[in-house]
């Protein structure tokens, strides 16, 4: 049995993650009220929130800037994967990490680009509808990212004069998880590949 080409493997990973991410987001968006929470276990909840910012609900800069940044980053990652897919200097694991990061970036880009057009507004009292008659809640590139995974892994009480705190509060989605896993594994096990191009460039300059 022939080994799957790295390029095809990356494409499959990207497609599977994007499809799973979008199916989950559409289900949550059309089945939950905004801020509604569903307890799966004592340490894992589905908690529907929307954010206009970056991964894990972080807000930085304008909405248009963030969306354009995501689009450019996704395009650059796709180009990098295409260029190195058959390069033996880069391991399969490294390309898988890039594919996960790319899939996560594209998954959130889709929300920003189209969700404002194809959904009406989610509120604590009304569920959103896909392709509503009155149109969407925002213009192109101004959609909100749907988040739902919440892991309150540990909790404790501070003194009475301090607020109650919960460890790991950010709510995130499958796309965020793909980006995080790809980045963590990349840094822990494949960081040496990030300097391959730089080292090759230096060697070529010395040989001139």
What are these regions (language model features)?
Residues 1-208:
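Alpha-helical transmembrane bundles and membrane-interface segments of multipass inner-membrane proteins
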């Amino acid at each position: 049995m022939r080994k799957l080409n790295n390029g095809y493997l990356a494409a499959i990973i990207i497609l599977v993650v994007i499809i799973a991410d979008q199916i989950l987001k559409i289900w949550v968006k059309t089945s939950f009220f905004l801020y509604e929470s569903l307890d799966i276990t004592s340490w894992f909840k589905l908690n529907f929130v929307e954010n206009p910012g970056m991964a894990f609900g972080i807000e930085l800069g304008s909405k248009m800037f963030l969306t354009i940044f995501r689009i450019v980053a996704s395009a650059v990652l796709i180009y990098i994967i295409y260029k190195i897919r058959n390069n033996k200097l880069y391991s399969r694991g490294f390309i898988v990490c890039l594919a996960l990061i790319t899939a996560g970036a594209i998954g959130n880009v889709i929300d920003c680009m189209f969700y404002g057009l194809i959904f009406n507004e989610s509120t604590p009292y009304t569920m959103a509808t896909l392709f509503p008659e009155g149109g969407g809640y925002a213009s192109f590139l101004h959609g909100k990212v749907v988040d739902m995974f919440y892991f309150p892994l540990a909790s404790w009480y501070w003194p009475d004069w301090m607020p109650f705190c919960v460890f790991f509060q950010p709510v995130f989605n499958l796309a965020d998880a793909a980006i995080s896993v790809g980045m963590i594994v990349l840094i822990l096990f494949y960081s040496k590949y990030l300097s391959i191009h730089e080292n090759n460039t230096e060697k070529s300059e010395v040989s001139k």
